[in-house]
């Protein structure tokens, strides 16, 4: 009988304990019964996911928001894939001719960098026309090429021939000047870039975009009325188009801001004298400004420290050109007022610099 009472007491105690457990708060029950887990992880979630995020959503992005647009800039410094000679090809028109055919080689030479420079040229050629000629194999290009400081010009070439001629380190594209500020005309740019990359022998080729310049204020160019025949309107529209292009065309590594450099230079004592006919660049300091922009944009080297000056460009003009280019590479789509160059010098040397340009003949 005594044993029977003990058993009943034990059973009663067990029932009481169970009743107490059933009254615990839910979190206390989970705490007392859960398995040991890795400290710092939330039980019940996949250890590989961040608690609180929706599975299947990249934890690095905020669901429901668009990724931040790329900030427009010059490319990262481009280097020679062969370790010796930097090879640059422009797919362009007369505005790429203005920028790279006359002084760019000498600037690189003064910096200690050997270059080969090519320009696939058709006057006034648009993005759409470049793509059409690529697709149909038209041999309508002049292939201008600078090797060892000597320029040659071969007519009747196709775009594919120019792309495959060298193992180019950088290939640039651009829009024709009249359409440069009309972003709707850029719709085939990605297709043109895809063609270039598919046919380039250097699979790591850098694609850059050449931002061209606004016309002079008194330009009579037939397409100037698209911009209300106003220089700053045209410049701002070019910047807007370049910004949108850079966001939409991820294959473009950066901008070569010749247009901003020219606009910067126009704030100097030289004023609105950077065009020879209202739209093409003035042959001497105008073209030199664009060339200075290209070398800094492609190398990241401060062009104001480069020793080269063409014989036909004065000391002061060269300083304006280099300062304008350097400022443009710092602020790609913003005009910088060249406050240090507001007054024309009383005398300005045109004596030959220590490094002279090669004779390119008539351009």
Task: For each feature predicted by the language model, list its residue ranges.
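Sec-dependent bacterial lipoprotein signal peptides
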Residues: 1-21
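Bacterial Sec-dependent N-terminal signal peptides
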Residues: 15-77, 82
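N-terminal module-boundary/linker segments of secreted carbohydrate-active enzymes
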Residues: 60-113, 117, 309-312, 321-361
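Structural recognition of the beta-strand scaffold that forms the well-ordered cores
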Residues: 87-91, 116-121, 169-174, 206-211, ...
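Structured segments of extracytoplasmic/periplasmic soluble domains
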Residues: 94, 98, 106-111, 174, ...
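Conserved SGNH/GDSL esterase-like catalytic core that processes O-acyl groups on lipids
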Residues: 98-189
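Acidic/His-rich structured neighborhood in mature extracellular/periplasmic domains
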Residues: 162-243, 249
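Catalytic His-Asp segment of secreted/periplasmic serine-dependent ester chemistry enzymes
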Residues: 226-329
């Amino acid at each position: 009988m005594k044993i029977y009472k003990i058993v009943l007491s034990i059973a009663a105690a067990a029932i009481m304990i169970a009743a107490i457990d059933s009254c615990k708060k839910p979190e206390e029950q989970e705490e007392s019964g859960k398995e040991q887990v890795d400290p710092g992880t939330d039980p019940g979630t996949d250890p590989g996911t961040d608690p609180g995020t929706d599975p299947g959503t990249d934890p690095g992005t905020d669901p429901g928001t668009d990724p931040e647009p790329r900030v427009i800039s010059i490319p990262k410094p481009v280097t020679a894939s062969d370790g010796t000679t930097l090879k640059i090809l422009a797919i362009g028109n007369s505005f790429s001719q203005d920028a790279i055919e006359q002084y760019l080689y000498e600037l690189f030479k003064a910096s200690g960098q050997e270059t080969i420079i090519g320009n696939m040229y058709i006057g006034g050629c648009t993005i759409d026309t470049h793509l059409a000629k690529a697709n149909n194999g038209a041999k309508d290009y002049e292939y201008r090429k600078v090797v060892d400081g000597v320029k040659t010009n071969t007519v009747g070439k196709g775009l594919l021939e120019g792309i495959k001629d060298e193992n180019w380190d950088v290939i640039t594209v651009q829009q024709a000047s009249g359409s440069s500020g009309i972003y709707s005309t850029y719709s085939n740019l990605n297709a043109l870039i895809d063609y270039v990359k598919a046919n380039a022998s250097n699979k790591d080729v850098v694609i850059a975009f050449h931002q061209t310049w606004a016309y002079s204020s008194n330009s009579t160019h037939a397409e100037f009325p698209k911009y209300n025949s106003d220089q700053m309107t045209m410049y701002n529209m070019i910047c807007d188009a370049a910004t949108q292009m850079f966001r939409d065309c991820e294959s473009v590594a950066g901008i070569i801001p010749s247009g901003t450099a020219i606009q910067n230079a126009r704030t100097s004592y030289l004023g609105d004298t950077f065009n020879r006919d209202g739209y093409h660049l003035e042959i001497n300091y105008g073209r030199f400004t664009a060339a200075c922009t290209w070398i800094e944009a492609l190398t990241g080297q401060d062009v104001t420290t480069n020793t080269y000056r063409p014989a036909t460009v004065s000391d002061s003009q060269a300083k304006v050109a280099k300062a304008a280019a350097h400022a443009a590479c710092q602020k790609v789509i913003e005009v910088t007022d060249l406050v240090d160059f507001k007054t024309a010098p009383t005398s300005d040397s045109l004596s030959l610099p220590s490094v002279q340009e090669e004779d390119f003949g008539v351009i």
